[in-house]
């Protein structure tokens, strides 16, 4: 099969390799679509991953091609998404069903081979069955959609809350859509620094503030930080109202220093500051993922307009480079496989 194999930092090769093995309890998926996550870019170009060689790609959808156990044969031919985290099932969070906080997890696309390939292996438990009316490109966005949902649940958004999300990536924009759904108000804002993102954000029904041209108000009940930079965290603590909640979701690109003034703001405003990580998943039981599938099916969360670029499997290098070089605005960059 064809795959993008990372052999070392900044050494990604498009090459022929064997289709992965399919042990008992696992499935082989024929990949149909795989989104490029912002975390894939440092993994490929600057920081590397846990071992080499590795195939990146953890946001994907496909069709079940084969299974390792006869008991799972009903999955063959089904359209699926996939929860990429493989829990150890031995640690305390796993025993409580909080698999997203597993202490010893495996992960498709970073700790084991992922979906920038024609085929990918995954445990059957991790498969999310899809209604066939959901396009594969939309289903490949279930992972960031569920992550955005999880952040809004951590925030505890109530009806009527005024909410800001700092960050114009797909997860930030979908978090704002979830916030709008839960607050039942149009008082939901995405804060960015690029005027070209306005049309993408406002196309989902959420308001946009270009921080370079407009100072945000300081009366938000909830602020979700979806960048991971010191300046955006500082903004979050500035614009949340006294007694409000700040949720930290953005992956940090380096150390996040905490100034004395910032610390005072947390104390004097009596803020709740929470972290969020990944998304809840429970197989076929209710979770962030089942809720995300429902939202795609009923159209209550809009994702089509967030796909700003598509590349065929043979041209995916262009997608990786586009995101790495930041020469043009983008939201979700999608790669298409086995079309």
PLM region spans:
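Glycine-rich beta-strand-centered segment in the early N-terminal region that forms part
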Residues: 20-34, 47-92, 131-133
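Short glycine-centered segments of the SAM/dcSAM-binding site in methyltransferase folds
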Residues: 79, 162, 244-245, 272
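NAD(P)H dinucleotide-binding glycine-rich loop of Rossmann-like/cofactor-binding domains
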Residues: 88-166
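C-terminal hydrophobic helical "lid"/dimerization subdomain
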Residues: 195, 287-339
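C-terminal substrate-binding/catalytic core of Rossmann-like NAD(P)-dependent dehydrogenases/reductases
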Residues: 256-307, 318
């Amino acid at each position: 099969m064809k795959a993008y194999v990372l052999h070392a930092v900044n050494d990604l090769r498009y090459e022929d390799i064997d289709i992965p093995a399919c042990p008992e309890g696992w499935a082989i998926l024929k990949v149909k679509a795989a989104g490029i996550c912002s975390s894939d870019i440092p993994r490929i170009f600057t920081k590397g991953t846990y071992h080499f060689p590795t195939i990146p790609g953890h946001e994907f959808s496909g069709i079940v091609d084969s299974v390792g156990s006869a008991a799972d044969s009903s999955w063959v031919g089904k359209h699926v998404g996939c929860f990429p985290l493989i829990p150890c099932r031995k640690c305390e969070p796993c025993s409580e069903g909080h698999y997203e906080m597993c202490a010893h997890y495996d992960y498709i696309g970073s700790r084991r081979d992922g979906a920038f390939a024609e085929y990918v292996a995954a445990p059957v438990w991790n498969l999310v069955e899809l209604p066939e009316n959901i396009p594969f490109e939309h289903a490949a966005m279930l992972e960031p959609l569920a992550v955005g949902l999880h952040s809004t649940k951590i925030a505890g958004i109530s009806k009527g809350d005024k909410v800001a999300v700092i960050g114009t990536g797909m997860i930030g924009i979908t978090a704002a859509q979830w916030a709008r759904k839960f607050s039942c108000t149009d008082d939901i804002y995405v804060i960015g620094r690029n005027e070209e993102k306005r049309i993408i954000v406002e196309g989902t029904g959420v308001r946009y503030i270009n921080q370079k041209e407009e100072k945000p108000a300081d009366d938000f009940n909830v602020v979700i930080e979806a960048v991971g930079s010191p300046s955006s965290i500082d903004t979050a603590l500035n614009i949340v109202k006294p007694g409000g909640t700040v949720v930290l979701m953005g992956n940090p690109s380096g150390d996040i220093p905490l100034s004395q003034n910032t610390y005072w703001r947390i104390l004097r405003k009596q803020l709740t500051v929470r972290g969020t990580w990944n998304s809840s998943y429970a197989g076929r039981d209710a979770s962030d993922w089942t809720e995300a599938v429902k939202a795609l099916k009923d159209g209550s969360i809009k994702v089509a307009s967030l796909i700003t670029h598509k590349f065929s499997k043979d041209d995916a290098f262009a997608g990786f480079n586009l995101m790495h070089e930041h020469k043009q605005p983008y939201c979700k960059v999608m790669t298409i496989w086995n079309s």
